[in-house]
Amino acid sequence: MGIIDKIKAIEEEMARTQKNKATEHHLGLLKGKLARYRQQLLADEAGSGGGGGSGFEVAKSGDARVVLIGYPSVGKSSLLGKITTTKSEIAHYAFTTLTSVPGVLKYQGAEIQIVDLPGIIYGASQGKGRGRQVVATARTADLVLMVLDATKSEHQRASLEKELENVGIRLNKEKPNIYYKKKETGGVKVTFTSPPKTNLTEQAIKMILRDYRIHNAEVLVRDDQCTIDDFIDVINEQHRNYVKCLYVYNKIDAVSLEEVDKLAREPNTVVMSCEMDLGLQDVVEEIWYQLNLSRVYTKKRGVRPVFDDPLVVRNNSTIGDLCHGIHRDFKDKFKYALVWGSSAKHSPQKCGLNHRIDDEDVVSLFAK
Ligand SMILES: Nc1nc2c(ncn2[C@@H]2O[C@H](COP(=O)(O)OP(=O)(O)OP(=O)(O)O)[C@@H](O)[C@H]2O)c(=O)[nH]1
């Protein structure tokens, strides 16, 4: 039986099985198997561009990557046209095999790369065609922008979410708070910091590990809300990505005010109309907010800081990250930094590599 058939068989069995106390462990086991087969299906994705690595630590010029996901004709091209410069000047992305047209959104001195993944995400989890590349690309995103058509049913959103869920992309979710380590010997040791309030029992954990042929491991569940699904995610950690998602409803000009109001109240959601030029600024601001980037202005000795060309780094970055962003080897030459701004105790503060910088700090770096 091919993997696709195996997946189908498990999905069918899951659909047939009634959900109750007596079956929850069996369902958990099936979910574990399903996760494994889905992974196999996507196994050669690593070599197909995008890579799925950490993507962006401190990217070259502070770029972040946003991927647009949506069904055809929801208005992705229109949105790209409105908020980006049409073509990327930077060609350091590896999606040449995709027909996506990356654009650059210039905002607050940052260059944010926006990649349109044409409506081919659909079917990716079934291993269809270029879907895998799309998935690999989506994995490297700092933010997923799900573009939805306000005039269409909620089905679009649910189906895209499910598609991403199936390939291991978790939207707006924290990593489960479970410590897990494979061991050489000693059997499986499971500890809960407080009794689980969900279906995640010691028995379930052991059963799933056995199915994965893992016979020695230490598991510490630190959150009583963790479920079997969370545990499966933890043991498949290399294939999971926790990505923020912003839901953007386009074409609000074509629905009633009540409907717009209802959509706009959903979490992580912005409403807009490309055609009427409504809400586009909100989309840009929300992208910026969700990316949670910091701007750092560099300053040479005796000269005013350069305020029009900040280095953009992830929020909570250190001077070390900043150095790495400037050049791979810069850290080795680093002597000290002078920092002005809200992260500094006094202005300027002399700091080392581990100092955490705030948004809009001014930094002078001194080399040996
Ligand atoms: N009523 C309305 N129509 C819109 C709006 N934005 C886009 N459209 C229309 O929706 C259609 C699709 O827009 P595109 O921007 O091409 O959509 P897309 O998602 O890029 O489509 P694909 O290229 O097929 O993936 C076009 O006919 C647009 O005129 C809007 O805000 N309101």
Swiss-Prot record:
Task: Kindly name one Pfam family recorded for this protein.
Answer: MMR_HSR1
Record bears the keyword GTP-binding: yes
* Annotated OBG-type G domain residues: 64-292
Which UniProt keywords are listed? Cytoplasm, GTP-binding, Nucleotide-binding, Phosphoprotein
Give the CC-aspect GO terms: cytoplasm
Task: Cite the PROSITE patterns for this sequence.
Answer: G_OBG, GTP1_OBG, TGS
| Chief place of localization | cytoplasm
Q: Which GO terms describe its biological process?
A: cytoplasmic translation; positive regulation of cellular response to amino acid starvation
Q: Does the keyword Electron transport apply?
A: no
Residues found modified as Phosphoserine: 364
**Span of domain TGS:** 292-367
The protein's location, in the record's own words, is: Cytoplasm
What molecular functions are annotated in GO for this chain? Answer: GTP binding; GTPase activity
For binding GTP, which residues are annotated in this chain's numbering? 70-77, 116-120, 250-253
Q: Which InterPro entries match?
A: Beta-grasp_dom_sf, DRG, G_OBG, GTP-bd, GTP-binding_2, GTP1-OBG_CS, P-loop_NTPase, Small_GTP-bd
Family listed? Belongs to the TRAFAC class OBG-HflX-like GTPase superfamily. OBG GTPase family.
Describe the task this protein carries out: Involved in ribosomal function.
Miscellaneous field = Present with 6200 molecules/cell in log phase SD medium.
Tell me the protein's name: Ribosome-interacting GTPase 2
Species of origin reads: Saccharomyces cerevisiae (strain ATCC 204508 / S288c)
By which gene is this protein encoded? RBG2
